[in-house]
A protein has these predicted regions:
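Active-site-adjacent beta-strand/loop module that shapes the phosphate/pyrophosphate-binding cleft
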Residues: 4, 72-97, 110-116, 133
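Conserved hydrophobic "DFG−1" position in protein kinase catalytic cores
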Residues: 14-15, 22, 88, 111
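The catalytic Nudix box helix
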Residues: 36-70
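NUDIX/MutT-family hydrolases
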Residues: 99-132
Length: 136
């Protein structure tokens, strides 16, 4: 049995006026699925630095008031995901950012009340974030 590659990432539950930002993946194997924005931790970064950088890259926004929520461990078919999640707020507005010349990082974004989370088709690992957030 092969050992799954482990990928360590960070994700943001961005809260504004009581609603939470969900983003729709705009590329790759999970295109069209909904997720909390974030990405991989680079060597030499701590989790908070990585999350601030990723949100700046993906949404051209700055975040603050980071509060740790949960760490999710999830086995996808080709890799093991460790996702450290923080609740945070925005310092400025967000905008769409292109992943490459032709692909948007995110196809769509929506602000949701936590009662509306169940209406979206989420990436499986993000469902554990939703559960943790609803318990807060």
């Amino acid at each position: 049995m092969n050992e799954l590659k482990t990928i360590e990432v960070v994700a943001a539950v961005i809260v504004k006026n009581g609603n939470v930002l969900a983003t729709q993946r705009g590329y790759g194997e999970f295109k069209g699925k909904w997720e909390f924005p974030g990405g991989k931790i680079k060597e030499g970064e701590n989790r908070e630095e990585a999350l601030k950088r990723e949100i700046k890259e993906e949404l051209n926004a700055d975040i603050d008031n980071l509060e740790f929520l949960t760490t999710v461990n999830y086995d996808y078919p080709n890799f093991h995901l460790i996702m450290h999640t923080f609740i945070c707020s925005l310092k400025n507005d967000i905008e769409f950012v292109y992943h490459s010349k032709d692909e948007l990082e995110h196809d769509n974004m929506i602000w949701l009340d936590k009662e509306d989370f169940d209406y979206l088709d989420w990436l499986p690992a993000d469902l554990d974030i939703i559960s943790a957030y609803k318990k807060k």
